[in-house]
Amino acid sequence: MNKYKKTYNVILDNMDLYEYRLRPISAIMYMQDAFARYTATKDMAAYNLFATNQYWIVAEFNIDFIKDLPFWSEEIEINIWISEITKLKIYTDYELKYKNKTFAKGNALWFILDKETKRPSKTDILTERFEICDELTLGEHKKFILPVATEIYTKIEHTNNLSDTDFNKHVNNKSYINIAEMTVPDEFRKSCRLKNLHIRFNKETFLGDTLTCTTNRTEKPYQYTHIIEKDGVSVCDIVTVWEQKSNKENIVEYNLEIKNEKQ
């Protein structure tokens, strides 16, 4: 089998602030969890690599949100697969569904790093344990390109706390996206939905580090860059593309839909 499938239910902690829907960041975390479970079936989980003085890192995520996101308690299905392996790089593609319809899809770039040198390890063992499925959800593994900023939109500072860190003792991926999300004004998020997120992780940061996140407008409407820096050096770059929410994207319409299904 060259695809791994896992189902989840949308829980309270993963809902957005307004419409009882799954937060986009939570969709990414479900995908990351599914990948971790997939690697465990091949004895390549984080704890397996720890014994060989290595660890997984994700370098990039690129994800499209193509339909309204599922509501609280609904079941979602994630399919994830290894789509490409080079000498040092590992690409995964993934698709998220609910009610048998795709609501998000994308890809991620991974490396296995040596703990001592912090350099990528060769991927020979992966080609032995994983089957390759060359199905590309976004058509290609697009290189991350940071658009030119035209003006600063918002800017905040954040000091990493205990809840930002993971078992590797560095700041986790979710926290960087949360920091960027905090720069998006409340009124904007009420009226717009996230259409695409492309993120590049550049450096690790740790407990107690102070980060600055600057969100910028670009030449394209509804496209923004989010630059997260430590001491003036970028640790994470994010590009987001947004669109106006549809009329169906509210809890009243959802309740009517559920009522009609029961009749």
Where is each model-derived feature located?
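Exposed loop/turn and edge beta-strand positions of beta-sandwich/beta-sheet ligand-binding modules
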Residues: A59, I90, K195
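Hot-dog-fold acyl-thioester-processing enzymes
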Residues: M1-V58, N107, D114-R193, N247-Q263
